A protein has these predicted regions:
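Contiguous, function-dense segments enriched for cysteine-driven chemistry
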Residues: 52, 69, 89, 137-138
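Conserved acetyl-CoA binding element of GNAT-fold acetyltransferases
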Residues: 82-95, 301-313
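Acetyl-CoA-dependent GNAT
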Residues: 71-78, 294-300
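Extreme N-terminal starter segment of soluble prokaryotic enzymes
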Residues: 4-6
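Amide-forming acyltransferase catalytic core, primarily the GNAT-like/NAT-type
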Residues: 9, 16-61, 83, 138-299
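Conserved GNAT-family N-acetyltransferase fold
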Residues: 57, 67-69, 86, 91, ...
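Conserved acetyl-CoA-binding loop-helix of GNAT-fold acetyltransferases
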Residues: 93-115, 315-328
């Protein structure tokens, strides 16, 4: 096979959902479906997208889809202008066609499209491919993760026992299942005790003049300042994008999964997935304090709470985000909690948390439309956000 055998199709935003519908039960996409219906529908509603924006590159060899690269339109805000950027997502080549230049061909097609392109969160192997293709580091986002699953001390002990028992041909399987249930019980009790202590401590720190309620959408008048709370260059994430995310999630609980493509490499389901949008007011409900958006997901046996978007009229109220995140971590017995650098001190002051907190980072790589594009001239100046790109959706 040579590059002449590969054909790249560019799908525009206006055509994305119809294209996704055509991939269902289509033999061309038997081995690789470029986008599921739930994502196509959501992306077609992107408030920062335009009908003519190219949002998907599909690679074909003969009559078979062998790879794809998604593009998510976004905006870069600087002191002088707002300009368009495109976030990379869902870059994939089917196993039997890897190391044959298809991944590079997709990356070259992005260059030829002349867009300000950014890709966040990639594997080490993908990073090496991007570097060889000429993509450069844009910077790193730092955040923190509370890893309560480190307290699951008994797992290793019981694993040793179960492994030993399984070598015995006659051992009753009920023994291993009983040990696993006992391990889950111990860990569950440990989490309950830890979160109860943290919640009580956190709740005492909050002023009594506080009310909150879960809402379907964030009031635009409340969230309007979100666009400008970061000084200097940053990727715009206004309240319109937050509400789009809340209305059109990319993930659904497995129990709610409906007909969709069968061969999309990246998951569209979780054992559990939900957003929690919270409007926060003073005790008399006359004064708006701000809002908070969390996501709660369960993948296999691990439950994760993420602090996504928040805004407070008074920056000193920022700790409310941590307090409410702990409340939901307690409710769902989260194994991990992702939170921003601004809340590091708060979380480390909670009883038992300090040694469970781990610093994390995401690498952003880019390829500019030109050497003088808005993205290119702001390298080193951009403030990153945890929700940049498609992170909040996944």
């Amino acid at each position: 096979m040579n590059n002449g055998d590969i054909r790249i199709e560019k799908i525009k935003l206006a055509d994305l959902y119809d294209f996704a519908c055509k991939t269902i039960a289509n033999p061309t996409f038997k081995k690789a479906a470029p986008i599921p219906l739930i994502r196509a529908l959501a992306q077609s509603k992107n408030p920062y997208g335009r009908p003519h924006d190219v949002v998907l590159l599909v690679a074909y060899c003969g009559d078979q889809c062998v790879g794809y690269q998604g593009l998510l339109p976004g905006l870069l805000k600087t002191e002088v202008q707002t300009s368009r950027v495109y976030w990379g997502m869902a870059w994939y080549v089917i196993p039997e066609f890897r190391r044959q230049g298809i991944g590079n061909r997709l990356l070259e097609e992005i260059k030829n499209t002349k867009i300000d392109y950014i890709t966040p969160q990639m594997t080490a192997s993908a990073e090496s491919v991007f570097r060889r293709a000429g993509y450069k580091d844009l910077g790193r986002l730092t955040y923190f993760q509370l890893r309560v699953d480190r307290l699951n001390f008994s797992t290793g002990f019981f694993d040793v026992i179960i492994t030993f028992l399984r070598k015995k041909a006659t051992y009753p399987k009920i023994i291993s299942s009983g040990l696993m249930r006992f391990n889950r019980l111990i860990y569950s009790i440990t989490k309950r005790v830890l979160y109860r202590q943290a919640w009580q401590s956190s709740h005492r720190r909050q002023k009594p003049n506080l009310r909150w309620k879960v809402v379907d959408q964030i009031d635009e008048s409340v969230g309007a300042p979100l666009n400008w709370q970061v000084k200097g260059p940053s990727f715009l994430r206004g309240v319109e994008v937050v509400n789009w995310m809340l209305k059109h999630p990319w993930l659904v609980p497995k129990s709610e999964k409906k007909t969709d493509v069968a061969n999309f490499y990246f998951s569209v389901t979780r054992e559990m997935f939900t957003y929690v949008a919270i409007a926060i007011n003073s005790s008399d409900s006359r004064r708006t304090k701000g809002f908070l958006v969390l996501s709660v997901s369960k993948k296999k046996t691990k439950t994760r709470v993420k602090i996504l978007d928040s805004y407070f009229n008074n920056p000193e109220d920022n700790e409310i985000a941590a307090c409410l995140a702990l409340r939901y971590a307690k409710i769902f017995l989260a194994d991990r909690v992702d939170f921003p650098v601004s809340l590091e001190k708060y979380f480390k002051q909670m009883t038992g948390f300090k040694k469970l907190i781990k610093k994390q980072s995401h690498l952003f790589m880019f390829y500019p439309a030109s050497s003088q594009s808005p993205l290119a001239v702001n390298i080193g100046k951009i403030a990153f956000n945890y929700c940049d790109g498609d992170t909040a959706f996944t």
